[in-house]
Amino acid sequence: MNSAWALLRLASPQLPIGGYSYSQGLEMAVEQSIVVDPQTAGRWISDQLLLNLARFEAPLLLAHCEAASAGDWGQLLQVSEQHRASRETRELHQESRQMGYSLQQLLNGLPELDRDARHFLEQTAEPHLALGWALAARAWQISPQDALAAWLWSWLENQLAVLMKTLPLGQQAAQRLTSELLPLLQQAQVNATRQDTHHAGSAAFGLSLASMAHERQYSRLFRS
């Protein structure tokens, strides 16, 4: 079987985990006129990529995938707890928890998940997105690096979808912005590979403040 199919499946917006229900603070950034056009949108996304994802979220996701791929359940549990403790707002915690639950329901109904991984998933009370993503990659025999690339692409695609609904940003403008951001996506993956999870960290105050404000936003398109 062509391995690219499994990778496309994991990165597909058709994966039923609800990722396109959330904006990760971007809707509030538009509401507060921090993001007003393609240029400011590009700055917001590039800052998130290089100052947050590349330094913390992506290394942690990669650590999940490496532990799951190797069947190192103790290490997977450890990084899973680190991920859970790092959610800075209620909104971000619930987002990760809901998407993790959706992945759990999906994996429970699939024959590809092996017995050890299924047992680990059953013993996990509240699986979050990174954990579910790592187990899905194991089930579909996707390498940790490819699973990280799929996750980064899904994140970027979701941010662009948010912009098309809120800014609004046209499809052609979104594609031009994608071309500008793809090198940064690659840079984020490389940085994540070099980052030890023991030293990983970021101070994404803008994201946290936007997320907290979004929890109280009067009118919104995306979930909180």
From Swiss-Prot:
Q: Which UniProt keywords apply?
A: Chaperone, Cytoplasm, Nickel insertion
Gene3D superfamilies registered for this protein in UniProt: Urease accessory protein UreF
Q: Which InterPro entries match?
A: UreF (IPR002639), UreF_sf (IPR038277)
The entry lists its GO molecular-function terms as: nickel cation binding
- A GO-annotated cellular component: cytoplasm
Kindly list the places in or outside the cell where this protein is found, as annotated in its UniProt entry: Cytoplasm
**Subunit structure comment from the entry:** UreD, UreF and UreG form a complex that acts as a GTP-hydrolysis-dependent molecular chaperone, activating the urease apoprotein by helping to assemble the nickel containing metallocenter of UreC. The UreE protein probably delivers the nickel.
Family classification: Belongs to the UreF family.
What does this protein do, in the record's words?
A: Required for maturation of urease via the functional incorporation of the urease nickel metallocenter.
Return the protein name: Urease accessory protein UreF
Q: Which organism is it from?
A: Pseudomonas savastanoi pv. phaseolicola (strain 1448A / Race 6)
Gene designation:
ureF
